[in-house]
């Protein structure tokens, strides 16, 4: 069988195959013969115009694979596919050397880690700023080629990071600039070039807590009087003491030091008691009405004078039946759900109840 006369041979043999085989088997057999002969012809003449039919072969195969250049199941694993396509697409890996990759790829180290590596590799464990620049440029070609301001970043890290200490130059040592050394307490923070910032934050937080504890211990001795106990750290005024004795608030000592917060929480406590009183019997409402009014008086000064006006306005409704006032009050209580609205609805019930009893 000659590969040159292959199309004419397929055209002559196609009717015979179509009579004895179904259409799917005919296409599979013809495609297999065409692929084998095309691979032989493709090894001899590798031109760009002949690559298009080879991509089309993969489309007609049953398990289609979009990655045709990887020699998957969708393409026949012939030597021509592995040598021509894979070799040309991935040939840049053989050209690029390790040094060229290092010039392109940025090293996975922070500027603080680069400074620490430079100082640790120095014989005397100290370097000047120019020597740190030289170490980074010599060991990492990316920074030698790049001009993105990495020297400014290194200079800022030296001045802002507490792990790097500035050492003045000796008088007998000629040259410019001071030396930079690494703090011995921070040597464990650098693990294989990676700077562990979490440990530094924990040490700073522990030292800050120790300073605050010392300040609190010395505060009573400086500002406290001789007759006061050392446990009393927050000052108290006579107004706050009278308010706490009269209302018996359960708020903590740190909150009661502010008069505004004291009045606010006492009014909120009175609002909570009114929500409980709403669920009690109507016979106890008259006894608790004065407490509710005094609780609202701490919240605002105008809320005490308003019920007297409501009493005069509600005098017109005293002749209503008791069951009608009860139904209207039940509807009002179901309409409002918050503590603020419950307080005023309970007060309106109080006045309506007093009018019905009279």
UniProtKB/Swiss-Prot annotation:
GO biological process, alphabetically ordered: positive regulation of DNA-templated transcription
Predominant cellular place of this UniProt entry's protein: nucleus
Keywords for this protein: DNA-binding, Nucleus, Transcription, Transcription regulation
InterPro entries: Fork_head_dom, FOX_domain-containing, TF_fork_head_CS_1, TF_fork_head_CS_2, WH-like_DNA-bd_sf, WH_DNA-bd_sf
Record flagged with keyword RNA-binding: no
One Pfam family hit: Forkhead
Gene Ontology terms for molecular function: DNA-binding transcription factor activity; sequence-specific DNA binding
Bias-annotated ranges (Polar residues): 1-13
Region entry Disordered, spans: 1-25, 191-255
Protein name per Swiss-Prot or TrEMBL: Forkhead box protein I1c
């Amino acid at each position: 069988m000659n590969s040159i006369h292959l199309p004419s041979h397929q055209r002559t043999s196609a009717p015979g195959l179509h009579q004895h085989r179904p259409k799917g088997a005919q296409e599979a057999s013809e495609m297999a013969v065409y692929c084998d002969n095309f691979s032989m012809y493709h090894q001899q003449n590798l031109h760009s115009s002949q690559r298009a039919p080879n991509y089309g072969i993969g489309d007609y195969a049953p398990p289609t694979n979009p990655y045709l250049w990887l020699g998957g199941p969708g393409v026949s694993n012939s030597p021509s596919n592995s040598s021509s396509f894979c070799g040309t697409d991935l040939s840049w890996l053989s050209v690029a050397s390790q040094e060229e990759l290092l010039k392109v790829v940025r090293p996975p180290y922070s500027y603080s880690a680069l400074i620490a590596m430079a100082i640790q590799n120095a014989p005397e464990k100290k370097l000047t700023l120019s020597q740190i620049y030289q170490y980074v440029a010599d060991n990492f070609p990316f920074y030698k080629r790049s001009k993105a301001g990495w020297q400014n970043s290194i200079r800022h890290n030296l001045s802002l990071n507490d792990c790097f200490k500035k050492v003045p130059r000796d008088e007998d040592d000629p040259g410019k600039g001071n030396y930079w050394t690494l703090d011995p307490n921070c040597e464990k923070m650098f693990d294989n070039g990676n700077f562990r910032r979490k440990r530094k934050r924990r040490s700073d937080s522990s030292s800050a807590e120790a300073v605050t504890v010392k300040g609190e211990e010395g505060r009573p001795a400086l500002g406290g009087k001789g007759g006061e106990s050392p446990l009393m750290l927050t000052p108290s005024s006579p107004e706050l003491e009278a308010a706490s004795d009269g209302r018996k608030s359960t708020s903590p000592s740190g909150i009661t030091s502010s008069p505004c917060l004291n009045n606010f929480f006492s009014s909120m406590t009175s609002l909570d008691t009114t929500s409980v009183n709403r669920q009690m019997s109507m016979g106890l409402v008259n006894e608790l009405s004065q407490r509710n009014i005094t609780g609202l008086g701490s919240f605002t000064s105008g809320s005490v004078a308003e019920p007297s006006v409501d009493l005069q306005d509600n005098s017109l409704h005293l002749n209503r039946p008791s069951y009608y006032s009860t139904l209207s009050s039940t509807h009002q209580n179901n309409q409002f759900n918050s503590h603020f609205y419950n307080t005023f609805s309970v007060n309106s019930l109080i006045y309506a109840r007093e009018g019905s009893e009279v």
